[in-house]
C-alpha cells in the first residue's frame, strides 16, 4: 500500500508464481521510473539482512495482467478520494475465479482495513446478532456497538 499523508494512495498487488520475497521482508519501497516515450516502470526495493539494497525491477511484468489492472483501478479510486470503506466494499464485490478466505481480493481488503480510523461506520452492515445498523471498525475489525458482536478474536 502506497501512502501519502499516512492515507492509502495506491495499491501494488497481483498474483504471481515468479515474484519471490524472502520471508524476513516486511516492508520495502516502490520506485517509479518514467522515460520519455516509454511506459512507467515500478520497481520494488528492500534492504536485505546485511543492509544491502535489493531491487526487483518491473513489478507490472511480474504479476498476472488482470490483477495488475485491478490494482491500477483501485489506485485511481483511492487517489480520487473514495472513502476506504467504499473501496473495500467495491473490492469485496469483484468477481474473481477463486472465492475463499485467502483470495487476492480478501488480501487487499485486509491490507486496507489497517488504515480505517476506529469508529468509522461500516458500509451497509447490519449486525447478524441484534439486527442493528451500529457496526463500526475498531482495530481493523467490525464490531457492533449495540451488542458487541464481532468475528475478530
Identify the function of each model-found stretch:
Residues 1-153:
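Long, C-terminal-biased catalytic regions of enzyme "large/alpha" subunits
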Amino acid at each position: 500500500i502506497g501512502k501519502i499523508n499516512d492515507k492509502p494512495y495506491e495499491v501494488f498487488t497481483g498474483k504471481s508464481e515468479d515474484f519471490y520475497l524472502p520471508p524476513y521482508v516486511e516492508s520495502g519501497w516502490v520506485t517509479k521510473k518514467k522515460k520519455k516515450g516509454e511506459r512507467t516502470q515500478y520497481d520494488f526495493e528492500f534492504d536485505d539482512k546485511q543492509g544491502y539494497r535489493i531491487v526487483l525491477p518491473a513489478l507490472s511484468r511480474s504479476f498476472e495482467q488482470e490483477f495488475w489492472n485491478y490494482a491500477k483501478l483501485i489506485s485511481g479510486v483511492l487517489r480520487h478520494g473514495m472513502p476506504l470503506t467504499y473501496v473495500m466494499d467495491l473490492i469485496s464485490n469483484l468477481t474473481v475465479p477463486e472465492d475463499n478466505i485467502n483470495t487476492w481480493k480478501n488480501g487487499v481488503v485486509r491490507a486496507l482495513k489497517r488504515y480505517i480510523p476506529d469508529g468509522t461506520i461500516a458500509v451497509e452492515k447490519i449486525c447478524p446478532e441484534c439486527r442493528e445498523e451500529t457496526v463500526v471498525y475498531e482495530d481493523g475489525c467490525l464490531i457492533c456497538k449495540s451488542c458487541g458482536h464481532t468475528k475478530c478474536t
